[in-house]
Amino acid sequence: MTFNNKTIEELHNLLVSKEISATELTQATLEDIKSREEALNSFVTIAEEQALVQAKAIDEAGIDADNVLSGIPLAVKDNISTDGILTTAASKMLYNYEPIFDATAVANAKTKGMIVVGKTNMDEFAMGGSGETSHYGATKNAWDHSKVPGGSSSGSAAAVASGQVRLSLGSDTGGSIRQPAAFNGIVGLKPTYGTVSRFGLIAFGSSLDQIGPFAPTVKENALLLNAIASEDAKDSTSAPVRIADFTSKIGQDIKGMKIALPKEYLGEGINPEVKETILNAAKHFEKLGAIVEEVSLPHSKYGVAVYYIIASSEASSNLQRFDGIRYGYRAEDATNLDEIYVNSRSQGFGEEVKRRIMLGTFSLSSGYYDAYYKKAGQVRTLIIQDFEKVFADYDLILGPTAPSVAYDLDSLNHDPVAMYLADLLTIPVNLAGLPGISIPAGFSQGLPVGLQLIGPKYSEETIYQAAAAFEATTDYHKQQPVIFGGDN
């Protein structure tokens, strides 16, 4: 028995009416995970024992009829701490790390009665855009197993797209929720920086990281954000939740909404079919009553360079804690303290992680700080100001999520710059701390194309409103890959 084609609200009704139990739903979800796992490699850990214990406790306490997420399974990216469940960040360095606490986002989800069924595969320490840098092997795209699923939240996206789970959590530092959502044809949101606590998230770029939700539909995505968003004293950068219900505007029309279409987002390097899909989406928004006009974000072209200086610099600092002494991998061939440090880190980290540590260390080094890190911070300010100018006159920004559809596995592994450029359209959103969503907008070569909507800070409910209006009048989100049971 499978329930993966039922929405969260449909599942809730079945649970409340006792047509199914939380244990039965969890068991069915675990079977969906296992039956697809060999093809996808989307999980690092399947937490069967812990999930069934949680489900039994919820059944004994009774489903909360007023809480739509009570008894619903949840997959969690492997860089988000889960009490008693391995949390490896898909790295050899943390191959045996089992936290003794839940990340705040996970704790919030559990408080709502959600059941953690496993930890999803990812690029190592969230460093990568293809899902291929994991110590545990590459995740496959749900639509075509010869293609990348995007990254770094590769497993979280593939798991939802393939029907392994209905909901999952990812993290987004430069596009790591939105790009895999686009490549797998689902809905992924990066919230405003500070909306979801980073406590318990294994840090990559602390001024950029944000936990966010994956789901098949816009409303289900918003329901999960409702569950995980909170101010948190354990995260000094968390902000008060300004929206009581992120679904509040879903279903409202968008007549008169002003949407900006940056010319830079449809320029050089954008696949022609992706460009055509986004222009058609813009026309669709106009048919729904929105006003779509071209604007300019002149400094967005510097986003990738700025990001890789700032993110790598922050990573080089954050990853200093992995030294082979306190926890995680320790080299066995070391004979003194220096060798423990050097050998453990050189053997425990993968090539992409070491590349970024080197870049960040160089950018922060004496004599180069002003030329690189300081200048990157100054250009980041210009990118923020570009967005502020546009949002003075417009409600949202529209564009593609990625310059292309999913590409072949192992096709860009030896060209890191080309892979970095795949995040060209998502990175500026992180640099500015803004919310952004990717929703399905069409297909090219049989693969999903993602549309990105960006809003000013704390405008998630408006983003969901526009995304839901598009979704309600198209059927791209209804199409499913073969592994789920679709025709594609």
Curated annotation (Swiss-Prot):
It is an enzyme of class 6 (ligase). Transmembrane segments: none annotated. Its EC number is 6.3.5.7. The active site is at residues 77, 152, 176. GO terms for molecular function: ATP binding; glutaminyl-tRNA synthase (glutamine-hydrolyzing) activity. One of its GO terms (biological process) is translation. It comes from the Bacteria. Belongs to the amidase family. GatA subfamily. Disulfide bonds: none annotated. Keywords: ATP-binding, Ligase, Nucleotide-binding, Protein biosynthesis. It catalyses: L-glutamyl-tRNA(Gln) + L-glutamine + ATP + H2O = L-glutaminyl-tRNA(Gln) + L-glutamate + ADP + phosphate + H(+). The keyword Nucleotide-binding applies. The keyword Ligase applies. PROSITE patterns: AMIDASES. It comes from Streptococcus pneumoniae (strain CGSP14). InterPro entries: Amidase, Amidase_CS, Amidase_dom, AS_sf, GatA. Heterotrimer of A, B and C subunits. NCBIfam families: gatA (TIGR00132). This is Glutamyl-tRNA(Gln) amidotransferase subunit A. The gene is gatA. Allows the formation of correctly charged Gln-tRNA(Gln) through the transamidation of misacylated Glu-tRNA(Gln) in organisms which lack glutaminyl-tRNA synthetase. The reaction takes place in the presence of glutamine and ATP through an activated gamma-phospho-Glu-tRNA(Gln). GO terms for cellular component: glutamyl-tRNA(Gln) amidotransferase complex.
